[in-house]
């Protein structure tokens, strides 16, 4: 059984203008991560779980919807999933 650890910012991010459907998907995502860990998240194609690059190297991302992402890291030796951020992904380039 994996543990889920949320950064203190996550509560503030979720309390904002996050749609209820995204909150439900995030709770389901946490249930899957808690029970089966990163392998379970990768097995469900709807999450489109993937490694991140550049400044987020070492982190992973799962889709909660077309726009929303949960960004997290895995600490395998402690069976821990650290949620860093739940955010509306911005596709605009600077």
Task: List PLM regions with ranges.
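Hydrophobic/aromatic beta-strand elements that line small-molecule binding cavities or substrate pockets
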Residues: 70
């Amino acid at each position: 059984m994996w543990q889920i650890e949320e950064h203190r910012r996550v509560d503030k991010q979720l309390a904002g203008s996050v749609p209820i459907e995204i909150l439900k998907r995030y709770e389901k995502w946490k249930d899957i991560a808690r029970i089966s860990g990163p392998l379970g998240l990768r097995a469900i194609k709807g999450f489109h779980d993937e490694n991140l690059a550049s400044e987020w190297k070492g982190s992973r991302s799962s889709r909660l919807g077309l726009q929303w992402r949960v960004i997290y890291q895995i600490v395998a030796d402690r069976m821990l999933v650290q949620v860093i951020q739940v955010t509306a992904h911005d596709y605009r380039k600077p």
